[in-house]
Amino acid sequence: MTMRWLMPLALAGALFAQPNTLTRQEVDDGWVLLFDGESLFGWTGIGPSKWEVKDGAIATEPSGMGWLRSGSQFADYILKLEFRAAENANSGLFLRSATAGEPHVTGYEVQIWNENPNPKFKTGSLVNHVTAKPAKFKGGQWNAFEIRVEGDRWAVKLNGKNILQATEGKSKIGHIGMQSNGHKIEFRNIKVKPLGLAPIFNGKDLSGWRKVDTPRAKEPPVWSAKDGMIHVEKGPGQLETKAQFDDAVIQMAIRANAQGPTHHPNSGVFLRGNANQFWTGYESQIRNEYKDGDRTKPVDFGTGGIYHFQPTRKVVANDNEFFVKTIVMRGRHFGVWINGIPVTDWEDPHPEGEVIRNKQAKLGAGVISLQAHDPTTNLDFKNLRVAKLPK
């Protein structure tokens, strides 16, 4: 693991993070990185434009028209990023844009163009919708956008200055993207905080949850609520929500309590499971173990991987420390972040059905379950929150 990947934890006491990292406070507040500073993981290029990572930024040269879009789709959120371009450059940010079609038509474009001949839609405006206050980005320097979109409400800041507040409700959810429009432009520090998450654990008792044990369990799991946490020991078994969810953003803090250097508690978060049925649905793995001292070699799919299907690309978390897991699932697509670092970006390619282990894609609603894997299970969960996503 590079120092950049360790930085979010190393900067626990810092007020500001280095480029393309998060502070510990940002991690705890639910921010995630869309750009890891090293690769285009989690992004897809559309059109003939060419994108590359150079000097800690995503850059495009004058190589053709197109856009680079996020794998996951978001509804309500705060987006922060920095960009650098010549003063006469023409680009934009696409928000809530559909997978297919023109992104500024299916969603919205926040303009990056000081010299637009149409005075209504210069930098910071929602193109074809809302005019921003007069504002210019600084050519050749890093500029900061902060965009908040929540329901139909929009707010845009450029370099800390409020330049747009509006009500616009054409599109409710979609990809986040960056435009290539024939000019060189760079982007970095791209991070998102999902909004609208509500607790699914009251911090006091297991109201709203249901225990599901297996008859073969020699040591049934012991679930308890204490000090704002769900604690579990022993197993196998599971604790599932009574409510059901299909497309959603899920966040929680997890601690795997290892009992020694060779003990790495095995658990998981099951998604879209069948109520009262043991270990069904997609499993977002919890296992902070890796091979040969290399965090890019996860054991048993690794924390943040999709069990049976997609290993995590890096084991970011450590045992005996709380880490924050963020899951964004919409339709067939699953994005997972650990401590705000993107580790899984996966699309289920299988035909639709109900039995995931039979290589069927389950798209309907189901319960969220916490797994007690075996008699050595020992974990804590806290700050469990969910936001349902619009269709």
Where are these regions (language model features)?
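Hydrophobic h-region of N-terminal signal peptides that target proteins for export
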Residues: 9-17
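Carbohydrate-interacting regions of secretory-pathway proteins
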Residues: 18-391
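Sec-dependent signal peptide recognition
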Residues: 2-9
